[in-house]
Amino acid sequence: MAEALLIIDFQNDFTPPDGALAVPDGDRIAEPVNELAASPRFELVIATRDWHPPDHESFTERGGVWPEHCVRDTHGAELHPALDREERVDLVLDKGQDPATPGYSAFERPELGRLLRERGIDALTIAGLATDVCVRSTALDAIQEGYRVEIAGDATRGVDPAGSERALQEIRENGGRVAWAAASRTS
């Protein structure tokens, strides 16, 4: 079994204190994410970024539900500085570039599936932001693509606690697992 770690959207705009769409405690995932990324169990570590054009349909100014965030080539779209990118991230994959699609799932880009297949990856651990949006969408798409999926519960945070719990339950119901290192439990 070959396993990859996907770090979903650990970006400045999703983290307090100044993120345009800050996930509560989103900055607190840095340590568990870096610990995971340093683990020898992963054949590949990929970080994704929301990398929106300025006219993205998800922005409230254009009739969408989200404030403007992660606009490409801005400070907000950069990976969070606490992510040990140089030492631990093998590839950065941008998503959400089409202004007419939400871009929640890392699997919107066919390159991801192709790369994982080429490397013989059959299991994914997913960490990052936000549990109830992009982590959820990526996990469900990965399960549908046939990957074994584990969510690193300690290394994710969501926009809404109730929505995050619903997302984790949906992932479990579809065959994924949720692991909590701090509590030494898996569900």
Map each language-model feature to its residues.
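Active-site acidic carboxylates
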Residues: 1-96, 148-150, 159-160, 165-187
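Internal catalytic-core helix/loop-beta-alpha segment
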Residues: 78-129
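Glycine-rich anion-binding loop/nest that anchors nucleotide
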Residues: 122-134, 151-156
